Amino acid sequence: MLFKYWVVCLLLFILFIQARASSFMPAVTNYLAKDYEAGYQNWACAQGSNGEMYFGNSQGLLVYDGYRWTLHKVPGNHIVRSVYVKEDRIYVGAFEEFGYFKYSEAGTLRYHSLSKFLKNFPMENNEIWNIVELDGRIYFQSFSAWFSYDGKMVRAL
C-alpha cells in the first residue's frame, strides 16, 4: 500500500514537472543582421567586465552594449575570427592580422595592430582562429604558427 502511494506521488510529480517544463521559454533574443547592420556570420563571442558583448563578425568586431550595436573594422576589412577580452583590451584575430582594441580617453575603440611588429615572419595566408592566455601572455593561434604577446613584444613560436 505504501509503495503504491509513493508510485502515484512520483507519477504526479513527473507530470507536474513536465507541464511546467513545456511552458518554459529561455530568455534568448535573436538578432538579425539588419538589426546590427553587419555581416551575417558571427565567428566568436566574448563578454567584457563592463557587460559589453564582443562578436567576431564577417565585417569586423561587433560591440553590443545592451542598447546599440557598433561595428569596428580591422586593417584590410577582414573577417574577425577570434575574440578574447582581458581587462581593458579586446584581442582579435583575423586574416593576416591580429591585435587589440582599446578604449581611448574619448571613449571610442581604437585598434592596435600587433602583427605589424613581427620580424622575419610573413603573415601571408595566416588566419588567427584562436586566442588564449597562459602565464600572463596572450597567444594567437593560426593553422601554421603560434604568436606570443607579453604586453611589450610579439614573437612567432
Write out the residue ranges for each language-model feature:
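Carboxylate-rich, polar loop motifs that coordinate divalent cations or form catalytic acidic clusters
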Residues: 1-157
